[in-house]
C-alpha cells in the first residue's frame, strides 16, 4: 500500500490523508446531531478491535522529542489496551524518521507485559528487509509472545529518505520496481515462516543431520496464518489474496471512482476474498481496516477532536494518481457507533484498527481506549 495503513498524524488532530493535495468530496458525512442510541443491538458477530500506534516522538505537547519515552509509552499503552478489553496493539514502522523503526524488540517488550492481546505491525516496509532474517526475528518474537503476532508487511509508504534502501544495501536491478521486489521478498518470507526448506545442508559439517533442505529456525507453528499484506488498491488486494496473505487496508485508497470511500473499500475486501478462495487457500482469509474515531466525553476531547464531527471523505491526487481517504468519526459513543454501523467496509472487516495519538501520553490514550470499548459494547461486537 502507499502505505495504506501508514499516514502520519499530529497529536491533536485526527488522521487526514495528505491534506495539501486532498479536497473535500462527497461521501459519508457527520453532522454530530444523531440521536443518542445504540446503532446496533448487542448480539452481533465479534469484530476485533485494536489500536495502530504511529510512534511519533515529535510534536509532543509540553515535552522535547524523546525516543525512549515513546517506546516506554507504547508498551504501557499495550497494557492499558488489554485492560480496556481491546484485542490488538499494532505498530507503524518508519525509517530515517522520529518514529518506530525496529518493531520486533518493541513487540517482544509488549509481549512481556501482556497476556492476551494480539501484537501487530501495520506495516513493515519490505524495501528495507532481508526476508530470511526477518523470518528468524518474527518467529522468535512470536514464540516469546505465545503466538500472538499479527504481522503486516508491504511495499511501504512515501518517506523522508531519498536513498534509504540503498543505504541499507538494497538497490534495484535494471527493469525492477520496488513493487516487484517487495512481492518476491514477501513470498520468500512466507515460505520461511511456513517452515519450508530454504538452505542446502552441508553433510560434511557435522551439524546437518538430514539431506533435506534446512528450514529457518526457530519455527513458530501458525505464524504463517497471521501474516498480512498492506493493500492500498484493489489490484494489490487481489494479489494478496492469490498469495495467501490476510489483507490490511486503511484510511486511504490509491484509487477513486467517485463512490464513498467505505463503499469502494468494501468492494476491495470482497475482491480480495474472491481471489483468496479462487487460489484454494484454506480458511476465508482475514481482513482489517484502519479508521480514525474519537469518543468525545469532556471539554479536553472537544478541544482536540470536536471539529472532526463534520469530517467527511477527501479526494485528490497522490503519487501521480487518484486517491480517496475516509472521514474521522467523532462524537458521543452512540454517535460514533452509529457512524461505524453505516460503514460498509467496517461491516465487512474482521479487524478494525483505530489510529491513536500516542504523543498525548498513556493516561489520555487509556481514556480513548475505554471510549472505543464502549462503542464496541453498543454495537455488540465484543460478544
Describe the residue ranges of each PLM region.
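Active-site mouth loops of central-metabolism enzymes
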Residues: 57-71, 124-131, 223-231, 324-334
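Low-acidity, Ser/Thr- and Arg-rich intrinsically disordered low-complexity segments
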Residues: 5, 9-18, 23, 30
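Acidic (Asp/Glu)-rich catalytic clusters
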Residues: 43, 82-83, 107-115, 138, ...
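A conserved active-site cap/scaffold subdomain adjacent to cofactor or substrate pockets
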Residues: 235-237, 241-254
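An alpha-helical appendage that flanks or caps ligand/catalytic pockets
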Residues: 39-45, 172-216, 249-250, 257-349
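Flexible, glycine-rich active-site loops centered on histidine and acidic residues
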Residues: 45-67, 128-198, 255
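N-terminal beta1-alpha1-beta2 module of alpha/beta enzyme domains
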Residues: 33-117
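Hydrophobic faces of well-ordered beta-strands that scaffold small-molecule active sites
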Residues: 49-53, 89-91, 119-121, 149-153, ...
Amino acid at each position: 500500500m502507499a502505505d495504506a495503513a501508514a499516514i502520519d498524524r499530529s497529536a491533536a488532530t485526527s488522521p487526514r490523508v495528505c491534506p495539501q493535495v486532498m479536497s473535500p468530496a462527497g461521501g459519508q458525512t457527520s453532522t454530530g446531531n444523531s440521536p443518542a442510541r445504540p446503532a446496533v443491538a448487542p448480539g452481533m458477530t465479534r469484530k476485533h478491535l485494536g489500536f495502530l500506534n504511529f510512534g511519533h516522538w515529535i510534536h509532543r505537547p509540553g515535552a522535547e522529542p524523546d525516543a525512549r519515552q515513546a517506546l516506554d509509552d507504547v508498551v504501557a499503552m499495550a497494557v492499558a489496551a488489554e485492560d480496556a478489553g481491546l484485542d490488538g496493539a499494532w505498530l507503524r514502522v518508519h525509517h530515517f524518521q522520529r518514529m518506530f523503526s525496529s518493531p520486533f524488540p518493541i513487540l517482544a517488550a509488549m509481549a512481556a507485559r501482556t497476556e492476551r492481546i494480539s501484537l501487530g505491525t501495520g506495516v513493515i516496509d519490505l524495501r528495507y528487509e532481508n526476508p530470511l532474517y526477518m523470518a528468524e526475528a518474527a518467529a522468535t518474537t512470536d514464540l516469546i509472545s505465545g503466538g500472538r503476532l499479527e504481522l503486516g508487511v508491504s511495499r511501504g509508504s512515501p518517506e523522508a529518505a531519498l536513498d534509504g534502501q540503498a543505504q541499507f544495501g538494497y538497490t534495484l536491478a535494471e527493469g525492477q520496481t520496488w513493487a516487484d521486489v517487495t512481492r518476491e521478498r514477501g513470498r520468500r518470507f512466507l515460505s520461511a515462516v511456513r517452515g519450508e526448506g530454504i538452505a542446502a545442508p552441508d553433510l560434511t559439517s557435522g551439524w546437518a543431520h538430514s539431506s533435506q533442505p534446512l528450514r529457518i529456525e526457530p519455527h513458530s507453528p501458525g505464524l504463517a496464518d497471521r501474516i498480512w499484506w498492506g493493500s492500498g488498491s484493489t489490484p494489490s488486494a487481489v494479489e494478496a489474496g492469490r498469495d495467501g496473505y490476510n489483507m490490511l487496508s486503511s484510511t486511504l485508497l490509491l484509487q477513486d471512482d467517485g463512490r464513498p470511500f467505505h463503499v469502494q473499500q468494501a468492494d476491495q475486501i470482497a475482491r480480495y476474498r474472491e481471489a483468496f478462495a479462487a487460489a484454494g487457500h484454506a480458511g476465508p482469509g482475514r481482513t482489517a481496516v484502519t479508521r480514525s474515531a474519537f469518543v468525545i466525553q469532556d471539554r479536553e476531547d472537544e478541544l482536540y477532536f470536536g471539529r472532526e464531527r463534520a469530517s467527511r471523505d477527501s479526494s485528490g491526487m497522490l503519487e501521480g494518481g487518484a486517491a480517496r481517504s475516509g472521514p474521522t468519526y467523532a462524537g458521543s459513543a452512540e454517535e460514533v457507533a452509529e457512524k461505524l454501523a453505516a460503514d460498509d467496509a467496517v461491516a465487512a472487516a474482521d479487524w478494525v484498527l483505530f489510529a491513536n495519538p500516542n504523543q498525548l501520553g498513556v493516561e489520555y490514550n487509556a481514556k480513548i481506549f475505554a471510549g472505543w470499548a464502549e462503542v464496541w459494547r453498543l454495537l455488540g461486537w465484543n460478544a
